């Protein structure tokens, strides 16, 4: 299952201008098929950012809804084998402009979604903090992030759960000078803890976008780090004790490249995907494969070498 957004003309949602609606496509084994998704009443725009499936009849997709009142809300949809259905989330007075970016499920009754929320510290001060939600098969509940008391802004963009009680989430933390650095939290049992990440040497800016955990003691996260005005792919590996930065390949001729997603079916078999630019501003897709020893570029349609 793949999710995202699709721009639609003005009549959709009753809006006066073009906007986004959720996009859901399913691979049947031979082709991609479009599926109909639903949104809450009063929606102006909506998009999906992450999806995970515990079985062929149990999938969860998460994203963001913009209401006609101008307020953003998180969007969660469930696939029961026949249709996508919206599940309403609990409201929180302390949470403004929330967004969900990714979700991980270990069973139909155990899913965790991550993103960010904005909360007010006073009349003129607000901060961005991690948003973590837990699904128990009946309803969503808020889980406190380990970083809620930190005055530095943090958000989570990717999550992987190698077991029901253990999840790793990655994202970024804004520093005092305005730059960002890799940020990660781990759920071990019932509580979340901040993990010490690895900062790439010689860079003022870096973020992690996604993570995959092929085992309890092995996780790989991807993102980017800044090199002058350009971006370079960032790959970090966790061995159960700490995070380390590992060499990441860039496409030949790339002036800027970023890895945005990763999936692993074994500790020695992972595939990461992202985008790159060369001399023109046009973006191309690219992918890289991990064989247990090194990362190598994998040619793909519409990617490396394509116009």
What positions do the PLM features span?
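Residue-level hotspots at or immediately adjacent to binding/recognition sites across diverse folds
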Residues: 1-307
């Amino acid at each position: 299952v793949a999710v995202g957004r699709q721009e639609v003309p003005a009549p959709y949602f009753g809006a006066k201008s073009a906007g986004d609606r959720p996009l859901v496509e399913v691979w049947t084994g031979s082709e991609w098929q479009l599926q109909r998704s639903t949104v809450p009443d009063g929606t102006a725009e909506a998009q999906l950012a992450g999806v995970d499936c515990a079985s062929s009849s149990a999938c969860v997709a998460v994203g963001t809804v913009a209401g006609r009142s101008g307020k953003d809300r998180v969007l969660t949809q469930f696939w029961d084998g026949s249709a996508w259905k919206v599940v309403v989330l609990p409201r929180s007075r302390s949470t403004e402009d929330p967004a969900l970016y990714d979700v991980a499920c270990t069973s139909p009754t155990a899913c965790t979604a991550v993103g960010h929320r904005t909360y007010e510290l006073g009349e003129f001060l607000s901060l961005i903090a991690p948003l973590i939600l837990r699904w128990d098969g009946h309803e969503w509940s808020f889980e406190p992030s380990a970083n809620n008391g930190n005055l530095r802004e943090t958000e989570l963009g990717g999550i992987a759960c190698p077991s029901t009680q253990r999840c790793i989430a990655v994202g970024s933390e804004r520093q005092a000078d305005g730059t960002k650095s890799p940020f990660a939290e781990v759920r071990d049992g019932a509580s979340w803890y901040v993990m010490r990440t690895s900062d790439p040497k010689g860079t003022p800016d870096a973020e992690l976008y996604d993570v995959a955990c092929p085992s309890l003691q092995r996780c790989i996260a991807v993102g980017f780090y800044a090199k002058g005005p350009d971006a370079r792919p960032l790959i970090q590996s966790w061995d159960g004790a700490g995070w380390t930065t590992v060499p990441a390949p860039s496409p030949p001729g790339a002036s800027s490249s970023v890895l945005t997603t990763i999936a692993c079916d074994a500790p020695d078999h992972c595939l990461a995907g992202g985008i790159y630019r060369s001399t023109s501003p046009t973006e191309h897709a690219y992918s890289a494969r991990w064989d247990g020893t090194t990362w190598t570029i994998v040619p793909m349609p519409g990617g490396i070498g394509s116009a």
